[in-house]
Amino acid sequence: MAGILVLNGPNLNLLGVREPGIYGSDTLSDIESRLQAQARVAGMPIDFFQSNAEHALIERIHQAFRDAVDMIIINPGALTHTSVALRDALLATAVPFIEVHISNVHAREPFRRHSYLSDIARGVICGLGPMGYELALQAALQMTHRSL
């Protein structure tokens, strides 16, 4: 499947109930529905995958390469700050990606300020809430020449 893959890491399945003061009240399903509608307007296939397991995210990145996915939008959650393996999978497959964070990681605990992915990403969006996903999709559509 050519198109865009949206990957979400650990605990993002809890959006809507997890620390709403930080992450808001939108569920992951709410976010995916908006992205699906936006991609449909642009005629761009889009797929979604969430896992709490690092290895499952890595396998999905490998599959994205085999499927010739045009772009990945990834919110790696806490794996942002810990996963060399996730970084290596993105480097090995060379699928371009945009890193997204709902909260402003730079305004939080010091350990959240380092990302193993930011320096190899096409772009990084953080601190704009769930709207960050929509902005990432707009950017991905422009980068793949399928703007809304």
UniProtKB/Swiss-Prot annotation:
It holds the Pfam family DHquinase_II. It catalyses: 3-dehydroquinate = 3-dehydroshikimate + H2O. Pathway: Metabolic intermediate biosynthesis; chorismate biosynthesis; chorismate from D-erythrose 4-phosphate and phosphoenolpyruvate: step 3/7. GO terms for biological process: amino acid biosynthetic process; aromatic amino acid family biosynthetic process; chorismate biosynthetic process; quinate catabolic process. The keyword Amino-acid biosynthesis applies. Belongs to the type-II 3-dehydroquinase family. GO terms for molecular function: 3-dehydroquinate dehydratase activity. The gene is aroQ. Homododecamer. The active site is at Y23 (proton acceptor), H101 (proton donor). Its EC number is 4.2.1.10. Catalyzes a trans-dehydration via an enolate intermediate. This is 3-dehydroquinate dehydratase. InterPro entries: DHquinase_II, DHquinase_II_CS, DHquinase_II_sf. NCBIfam families: aroQ, PRK05395.1-1, PRK05395.1-2, PRK05395.1-3, PRK05395.1-4. It comes from the Bacteria. The record marks R18 as: Transition state stabilizer.
